Amino acid sequence: MVPVVALVGRPNVGKSTLFNRLTRTRDALVADFPGLTRDRKYGRAEIEGREFICIDTGGIDGTEDGVETRMAEQSLLAIEEADVVLFMVDARAGLMPADEAIAKHLRSREKPTFLVANKIDGLDPDQAVVDFYSLGLGEIYPIAASHGRGVLSLLEHVLLPWMEDLAPQEEVDEDAEYWAQFEAEENGEEEEEDDFDPQSLPIKLAIVGRPNVGKSTLTNRILGEERVVVYDMPGTTRDSIYIPMERDGREYVLIDTAGVRKRGKITDAVEKFSVIKTLQAIEDANVVMLVIDAREGISDQDLSLLGFILNSGRSLVIVVNKWDGLSQEVKEQVKETLDFRLGFIDFARVHFISALHGSGVGNLFESVREAYDSSTRRVGTSMLTRIMTMAVEDHQPPLVRGRRVKLKYAHAGGYNPPIVVIHGNQVKDLPDSYKRYLMNYFRKSLDVMGSPIRIQFKEGENPYANKRNTLTPTQMRKRKRLMKHIKKNK
């Protein structure tokens, strides 16, 4: 399971700045789900190869009425579901009553909490953080998030040791065998026979979507039984349920994000929908089913969730639920809207189903298997280079500064999603339009469906770069004769 780090604190203490610093602003997701404060941010970050989800919980105001009554419900939920909390305070503003109220709440939750004093630029860190020791949260880590000062130390001394304890790196990635074989080819070693077969592994399938789009109904329909979806057990509010199942002789692990709730606490949509749980399920899955409500159409929330799926590189099947009972005219309108708003997702299969009545559900697994097979298929260097050559013959790369970009060869750089690495000269200068052409050409030639495909470009290093030219003996003699001739004619 991908760990979760929550950034907590008063407004304007620098949570968003640290969030952007940790995620490097890539893969950031702005979510506007029901019950969530507008512009709540979720992003993917990593420390030395270990990925985690970072959450900017937004500002929390603690008052004399008690922090629990004033906190945004989603901020409280984020704290509950986080594995570790970075509690941020403003070193310039000093200790505030709201800080004390938040610290009191965090102490009661018994979460791993680290106190981070931000905005220490221009201050004596030791003197600036003295008052915050009264919060009773142990050691204080001074940083200046806007300039990056102290952030590396925070990562190395706080988050990294904690993540090593939570998720040891000994865990072997499913694709490790692929990388070992790839490195062997690169080093000119003979390809060893191995027993690794992606078909022997169960397909991890996550069903995600907004509240009330029919995820639970679809889960129950797939399993062929009514599952109890409300539990009253300690710890069941955080982790998704992993359900092994078999269909048509193929093993699956269904990641259920909709079925775990705490009894008596479901008051509105915010409790029924955990963004964190959904993002963790996406990261852990091989294939993601995105469920959309046909009666409500494509919302901004759907597009935000879709963006996270694409950035994660997961295979995708789009499921339009509640298709039954719609008139033919409405169905045509829904299809037009889908084509317009999802036109950029040309690789994913779209299914129109009724989870309640079961119509169309049986066809979903054919697309799931197709997407998984596409994302894990092995393709050799010779095949990829041949496809690249055919693409160049069909459409030459453009001229860059008067010279034609030369593509030399291609090889596999990874799987799930498939990555094609192309080597050549001036490849970094290729326009985006030609890069898209190559991506689509590889997709069509390899018959990749249901999975994104990524193209990476690498330039060969110029051995003479940054080196001074040296003349050959012949050139030296010619230069001497030329210099004598010039001096004689002066």
Curated annotation (Swiss-Prot):
GO terms for molecular function: GTP binding; ribosome binding. Residues 377-461 form the KH-like domain. GO terms for biological process: ribosome biogenesis. HAMAP family: GTPase_Der. Belongs to the TRAFAC class TrmE-Era-EngA-EngB-Septin-like GTPase superfamily. EngA (Der) GTPase family. GTPase that plays an essential role in the late steps of ribosome biogenesis. This is GTPase Der. The lineage of its organism: Bacteria, Pseudomonadati, Pseudomonadota, Gammaproteobacteria, Enterobacterales.
